[in-house]
């Protein structure tokens, strides 16, 4: 797909490129790179990717970038029994400690906040999107969450939010236009329950197990390669972590896809979806 008129696309490696030269004269920088993926495990995973973020922040500071937009995740709120439904941006950042993806995003937010604090003229927008999908491309996080929710626990019923990538792009544009300073949840209106997700995903029973057994089955399936969902994601399939989009909507943003539409667009049935 050719770029829009006036748009120049340059493919660079942020780990080695001269970022000061690339960012010179930029008014705003939007950093949407994924970093650690939802299926990553291991305590040393992601250090090199955070080093890349450090390079980007240093270069942005050196050349005088005034506005930075970074993509975090709604998962930084963590999935906890006492979470309000929905969560607003005023909720504390407390990711589930065993899920590296969420912990990494929280660390990214800390680094970006330190950059913003270095100069009162700097603005920082932190986008906290729900599970994001594209047409026929569920993405790594959607695949992980989908696999994890196929094993249902008696401890709770998961609530889901699914964001179309086009709506995430519109949110980034909105944040730049408003030069917004602070966190912004990015999600469709409302949320859907596990029964709706099962109906939209097609026929096929799911596993429903006691909490401890569900977690054990999830660990075994991940270890033998039958599931992309690491054990640390399990709390996100039990406790609520859906978010409110009110603050972003106040800036003029509106989702063009519902949860249901985004879920169907990005859903790929997995092994457990077809389990007899």
Language-model region placement:
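Mid/C-terminal beta-alpha module of Rossmann-like enzyme folds, strongest
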Residues: 159, 169-230, 265-267, 273-276
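Catalytic helix-loop patch of NAD(P)-dependent Rossmann-fold dehydrogenases
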Residues: 81-131
